């Protein structure tokens, strides 16, 4: 089942449901622009962009918030709420879409267990290591059970060992059926994981290597 399709004069990309895809390329190659297009932070100015059956280039503004519920997004800088503990950071993603307290109390501990942070639910971001903060960000991205997880340089601020742990976690998430798209500069991780790799240059996908 096709999850993502981009067609224009520069890019022709198809991603199937349940795939794990790396996007690599030098700074300014268009990797982060691709993430912003998929998040509907930027508008598609030409061609077609279809994600989970939604035509993004034709999407009305009022539809965007509902579409974004299908996505989980993780960033290099974690983007956690500094004045909220781990539990509250993750619960926040459910509150903004109107989930009940009962649902939140059941789901948040589940996802914290999934990312290995069940014991840290009362900790605040500044009490956590970089790797732990990224796990919180992952839990927040996963708590609403997204179809697609977008990770923009998720290991950019982490040491090699912690980076490897985060990538293993992303792989486990993918094995449960979530489509995962990872933008990265980290060649070691890309080479080690042997997944599909898209290489971008000047906004164009110049190679698409499938393992």
Regions picked out by a protein language model, each given a short descriptive name:
Residues 47-55:
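Conserved ABC transporter NBD signature motif
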